[in-house]
């Protein structure tokens, strides 16, 4: 993961992909209040652009469904290792916790 993030931070994401929609349930702990969360395009160890905005788990949990291009939904479903979830906060604006998607 680029950058140190929050060394105490922990998180868990469950991602569902349907035709034209990405849904994510997020849980984080041991970090300051989350201010943003996204799915980024990028393999392990690289930083990449935001491709899906998510609800920030500001109280530790969040659930969101975002409409996306069907092609992107297909990509996330077929090649999850090409994407990661990143949760941001004021202390770690580049990302407090990050997790690579996998099946």
Where does each model-flagged region fall?
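Metal-centered catalytic cores of metalloenzymes
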Residues: 1-37, 41-103
């Amino acid at each position: 993961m680029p950058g140190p993030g929050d060394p105490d931070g922990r998180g868990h994401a469950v991602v569902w992909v349907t035709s034209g929609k990405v849904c994510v349930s997020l849980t984080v702990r041991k970090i300051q209040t989350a201010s943003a969360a996204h799915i980024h395009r990028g393999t392990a160890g690289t930083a990449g652009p935001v491709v899906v905005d998510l609800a920030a788990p500001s109280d530790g949990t969040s659930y969101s469904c975002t409409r996306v291009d069907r092609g992107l939904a297909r990509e996330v479903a077929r090649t999850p290792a090409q994407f990661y979830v990143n949760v941001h906060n004021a202390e770690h604006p580049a990302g407090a916790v990050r997790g690579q998607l996998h099946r």
